[in-house]
Amino acid sequence: MITDFNARGAACLPGHLGIEIVEVEKGRVHARLPVRQQVMAPNGYLHAGSVVTLADTCCGYGCIASLPEGASNFTTVELKSNHLGTARDGVIECTAVAVHMGRTTQVWDATVSHNGKTIALFRCTQMVLYPKA
């Protein structure tokens, strides 16, 4: 599943930024993102959008890995982030955990860290999609 997720995102935004999924299980996903010039803001610090993309990618892949029987996909309907710190080098990591896995919605929390310190908290709600009859 890890290989599939990394291949799935390779030509899209996660791959463009360099996001690597390293662990996937039902209700939990872990990923990392190398901090480099392409993910920085003009002020020299990590761009908030890079952090949000990492967290949203973790939560989204977690949702896909945990879809209820009969569901075909999902769409994000709400997201929120709190940025508590930043990074200028190294690697940032994200762990997303399911808070609610219902038939019509899922809620996921993600924590983004740098060198063991939490730099962002993220929550998103996803609507579970089913094929049209």
Where does each model-flagged region fall?
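Terminal targeting signals and extreme-terminal segments of soluble enzymes
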Residues: 1-133
